[in-house]
Design a protein with these regions (language model features):
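Non-catalytic extracellular/periplasmic "stalk"
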Residues: 1-107, 111
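Catalytic cores of peptidoglycan-degrading enzymes
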Residues: 87, 93-217
Length: 217
């Protein structure tokens, strides 16, 4: 009887350990996926987030064998905690970046890149994306950040610029009304302005830019 109970307990422990190891691997894979997406967009992940603060002995491998002590089980729990912690940190970092839509549901009328300039009729670089919006429609922040510009800015007309950190900023142009001030802290989804046709514009729309280290991307 004792032998049967011992065998059953070992079997349960083995199943639990295998499940924990699977969860750890899944968390690590999700973290790597987020890091890869950010790297492809040119966003540099802070070094403290890029690598988990793991013990050197955690970089090990080999075929699975059922543990004879609780040490392996406890180590696996610790590794899972570290993997989940890193995943949450990287996910939180990514969520602060401007990956959302400033004009949900609105038609895109002009893409980023070279196009025929609507005023000069010749090829010119368009540094953002234009969304069809009526004057007075809501314009939303695409990520958390701090307002660094809020006012008239030449061809942009009334414009808001938000600093999201890590060299990333967003610009919202041709606004009819600005609802934030320079220095304000905003969150993703906040209404920061109303669309319009101020500045160098042929009609009501939202001009939206993402810049990395000052360069439109």
């Amino acid at each position: 009887l004792f032998s049967t109970v011992t065998h059953s307990l070992k079997s349960i422990e083995s199943e639990q350990l295998a499940h924990i190891q699977t969860l750890t691997a899944n968390a690590a894979e999700r973290t790597e996926n987020i890091q890869r997406i950010l790297a492809n967009t040119g966003v540099k992940i802070p070094e403290k987030l890029a690598q988990a603060d793991l013990d050197p002995d955690s970089a090990i491998g080999g075929p699975y064998e059922a543990p004879e002590t609780t040490e392996m089980f406890e180590n696996s729990i610790s590794e899972l905690d570290l993997a989940l912690d890193q995943f949450e940190k990287v996910k939180s970092f990514a969520r602060k970046l401007p990956f959302n839509n400033p004009a949900p549901g609105k038609q895109i009328t002009s893409l980023f890149g070279n196009r025929v300039d609507p005023f000069f009729g010749r090829l010119a670089m368009h540094a953002g994306i234009d969304f069809r919006q009526k004057t007075g429609n809501d314009v939303r922040a695409t990520g958390d950040g701090v307002v660094v510009t809020a006012g008239a800015m030449g061809g942009y007309g009334y414009m808001v610029e938000i600093d999201h950190g890590n060299g990333i900023t967003t610009r919202y142009g041709h606004l009819s009304k600005i609802l934030v001030d320079k220095g304000d802290t905003v969150s993703e989804g906040d209404i920061i302005a109303l669309s319009g046709s101020t500045g160098r514009s042929t009609g009501p729309h939202l001009h939206y830019e993402v810049r990395r280290n000052g360069q439109a991307v």
